[in-house]
Amino acid sequence: MKISFDFDSTLECEEMQELAIKFIASGADVFITTSRTDYHEGLKIPNNDLFEVADRIGIKKENITFTKFKHKYKFTKDFDIHYDDDEIEIDNINKFPSKCMGFLYEPKHNNQQANF
């Protein structure tokens, strides 16, 4: 099974990291698909926070995709599941034909339960 997570406001949250760790432990291939860019005007952007989380939970660097602000449905076609906090990205993933199912993640605020 191939599982993808957005990073900002999704995999950067501890409960989603715990979910990713469970998927990895069950043998799933886990990926990060982020709208971020890794280069801007020829300069490499470090994305240290993203790589730190990926290293800590066991996501391989080759499983990280920077979409450079392009729609994620173009990058998630071969995944089974993608989690994201962006409703438009999830709607697009579920609207365009592919095997990937998109699930909206709504981070919890002020001791509320997360919705995913």
Where are these regions (language model features)?
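Alpha-helical substrate-recognition element adjacent to the catalytic core
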Residues: 1-69
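A short acidic, amphipathic alpha-helical/loop segment
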Residues: 15-23, 75, 91-96
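Short, well-ordered alpha-helix to beta-strand connector turns
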Residues: 27-28, 61, 77-79, 97, ...
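Short, hydrophobic beta-strand segments that form beta-sheet elements in well-ordered domains
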Residues: 32-33, 65, 80-84, 100-105
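Noncatalytic linker/hinge segments flanking ATPase motor cores
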Residues: 45-52, 73-81, 103-108
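Conserved Lys-Pro-Asp/Glu-containing loop-to-beta segment of HAD-superfamily phosphomonoesterases
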Residues: 64, 69-93
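Asp-based, Mg2+/Mn2+-dependent phosphohydrolase catalytic module
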Residues: 87-116
